[in-house]
Amino acid sequence: MSAERVTVKEKVLSANDQLAAETRARLEAERVFAVNLISSPGSGKTTLLECTVDLMKPSLRLGVMAGDVQTRNDADRLIRHGIPVEAIETGGGCHLDARQVSRADLLFIENVGNLVCPAGFDLGESVKVVLMSVTEGEDKPLKYPAAFKRAAALVLTKTDLVPHLEFSLERVIEYARSVNPDLTLFSTSSYTGDGLAEWTSWLAGQVAALKRAQESAKSARP
Amino acid sequence: MHELSLALQIREICERELEKLPESRLTALGVEVGAFSAVEVETLSFCLQVVMSERFDGVRCEVIRQPGTAACSSCGLQFEVTQAPFECPSCGALARGVSGGDSLQVSYIEVESER
């Protein structure tokens, strides 16, 4: 009788991660910059996307995949803006996984409104962006560190409501940076249009950077 | 998060590993769970006991918590963190970012064989 310990070191979500890696490679080869938008329900993902699409549609080819637990409401709102939209009804699921995500310059993946589970599932996106409305409370980054830790950018939404709230922008920034100092921050109001120019020019910069990287990789090949 | 389905995937990983080890009996497994993996450790431990005991008798399930590391924004001290707020134990200032603590993996299995 012998006993031994065998080192495994296999990720529990390795099946999802493998699919995500395939999706990421395919998107990069097609030069599609993919943004996985994560937030609580009602923080304004769809509204921000409607404004973003209207501003960026003239210069870039855009696409949206909208995940909802039930209904196609978000997808239907976005279709009216004249871009290709794919609705993903999860039927009770509280996040998207790589199996559900498979041509555009810029693809938005509107995840299911939830700050816990979507943080854990890699979809093969280029970046995760976390949204947070000013009515949600300043300590969201501390309550849901996984989502903020893995995001490249934080978009504060509904900033037109700040005068009616006890809300400290400085505190949110301090909390968010304590989790992730590399977060790029945007303060936006889809209602007034404040901050949308900064947000869309950052997105356009990311798209351009991906194209440059792909072109130089292509010219480097013999 | 989805601790029961994670437990089932962990069992699958163990079963695949056991296929490589003929005539071995699984006696224990270790799962590493990061503090920022959005997984509830108590729930995962409970679910693991339930799903593992369906197939394997008397398996010991160890859940190893993996903390993250934070750096103080004021004095620069590096310290381990498992939950927010990430305050420096030395000077009380908030951290300037947290790294690590994202792990979610089957770290090891232990087996007994008749050899």
What function would you assign to each model-found segment?
Chain B
Residues 70, 86, 104:
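Cys/His-enriched microdomains
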Residues 1-57:
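Long, charged N-terminal interaction/targeting segments
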Residues 100-101:
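Short linear interaction segments
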Residues 2, 20, 30, 104-115:
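Long, charge-rich boundary regions
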Residues 72-75, 88-91:
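Short cysteine-rich clusters marking metal-coordination/redox-active sites
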Residues 32-36, 64-68, 109:
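Short loop/turn motifs enriched for small/polar and acidic residues
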Residues 60-67, 77-82:
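Short, flexible, mixed-charge glycine/proline-rich loop motifs
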Residues 80, 93-97:
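Short functional micro-motifs and their immediate structural scaffolds
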